[in-house]
């Protein structure tokens, strides 16, 4: 189940807001410019589906999203607990960073935490299968799928060079552990 927890950025122990209500999640996130939607997962994907098969299965949805956002490319990130780069990628994603474009993700399977840091607050959006999240350009954030990641997500990019992060150097993510 998807959840949203909002914290004062000086107090990781006591959420100011905790909800699993999709409408409230969307409203709270919209207030900081983040798009959040729950979609009925429109396509059944085999566990061993290739990235190309996943992109093709979701093509109508991708075309619509790419048209809305002006995106020029899409790819699939597929993480499993035995992925050879799981630890390395987790460490990279865990560091607070920004992008110069919106970060748009749709969870095909599995889950992960998108954590945004702005205006003295930390917004932990735990996204699950069927969730669409779009984090605006230049929003400080990090991502955590835990030490045993297991998810498939569509990633949509305006910049055709793909995922390009600009790390802030802020160590706040270490104070806000969100996944085991």
Swiss-Prot record:
Catalysed reactions, as listed in the record: 1,2-dihydroxy-5-(methylsulfanyl)pent-1-en-3-one + O2 = 3-(methylsulfanyl)propanoate + CO + formate + 2 H(+); 1,2-dihydroxy-5-(methylsulfanyl)pent-1-en-3-one + O2 = 4-methylsulfanyl-2-oxobutanoate + formate + 2 H(+)
Annotated InterPro entries: ARD, ARD_bac, RmlC-like_jellyroll, RmlC_Cupin_sf
Positions bound to Fe(2+): 97, 99, 103, 141
Listed GO biological process terms: L-methionine salvage from methylthioadenosine; L-methionine salvage from S-adenosylmethionine
Cofactor (UniProt): Fe(2+); Ni(2+)
Family matches, as CDD domains: cupin_ARD (cd02232)
The UniProt record lists the keyword Cytoplasm: no
Enzyme class per UniProt: oxidoreductase
Highest taxon in the source lineage: Bacteria
Feature type site, description May play a role in metal incorporation in vivo: 96
Cofactor note: Binds 1 Fe(2+) cation per monomer. Binds 1 nickel ion per monomer.
Residues reported to bind Ni(2+): 97, 99, 103, 141
GO MF annotations in UniProt: acireductone dioxygenase (Ni2+-requiring) activity; acireductone dioxygenase [iron(II)-requiring] activity; iron ion binding; nickel cation binding
Residues flagged as site, May play a role in transmitting local conformational changes: 102
EC assignment: 1.13.11.54, 1.13.11.53
Pathway per the UniProt entry: Amino-acid biosynthesis; L-methionine biosynthesis via salvage pathway; L-methionine from S-methyl-5-thio-alpha-D-ribose 1-phosphate: step 5/6
Record key words, sorted: Amino-acid biosynthesis, Dioxygenase, Iron, Metal-binding, Methionine biosynthesis, Nickel, Oxidoreductase
UniProt-annotated site: Important to generate the dianion, residues: 105
Family under the similarity heading: Belongs to the acireductone dioxygenase (ARD) family.
Function: Catalyzes 2 different reactions between oxygen and the acireductone 1,2-dihydroxy-3-keto-5-methylthiopentene (DHK-MTPene) depending upon the metal bound in the active site. Fe-containing acireductone dioxygenase (Fe-ARD) produces formate and 2-keto-4-methylthiobutyrate (KMTB), the alpha-ketoacid precursor of methionine in the methionine recycle pathway. Ni-containing acireductone dioxygenase (Ni-ARD) produces methylthiopropionate, carbon monoxide and formate, and does not lie on the methionine recycle pathway.
Subunit structure: Monomer.
Full protein name: Acireductone dioxygenase
Organism: Acidiphilium cryptum (strain JF-5)
Gene: mtnD
């Amino acid at each position: 189940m998807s959840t949203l927890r909002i914290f004062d950025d000086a107090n990781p122990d006591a959420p100011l807001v905790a909800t699993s209500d999709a409408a409230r999640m969307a409203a709270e996130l919209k207030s900081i410019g983040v798009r959040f939607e729950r979609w009925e997962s429109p396509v059944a994907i085999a566990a061993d589906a290739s990235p190309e098969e996943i992109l093709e299965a979701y093509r109508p949805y991708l075309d619509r999203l790419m048209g809305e956002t002006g995106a020029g490319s899409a790819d699939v990130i597929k993480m499993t607990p035995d992925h050879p780069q799981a630890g390395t990628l987790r460490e990279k994603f865990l560091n607070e960073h920004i992008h110069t474009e919106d970060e748009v993700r749709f969870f095909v399977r599995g889950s992960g935490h998108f954590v945004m840091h702005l205006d003295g607050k930390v917004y932990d959006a735990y996204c699950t299968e069927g969730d669409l999240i779009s984090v605006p350009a230049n929003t400080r954030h990090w991502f955590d799928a835990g030490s045993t990641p297991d998810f498939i997500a569509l990633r949509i990019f305006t910049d055709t060079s793909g995922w390009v992060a600009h790390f802030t150097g802020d160590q706040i993510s270490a104070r806000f552990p969100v996944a085991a």
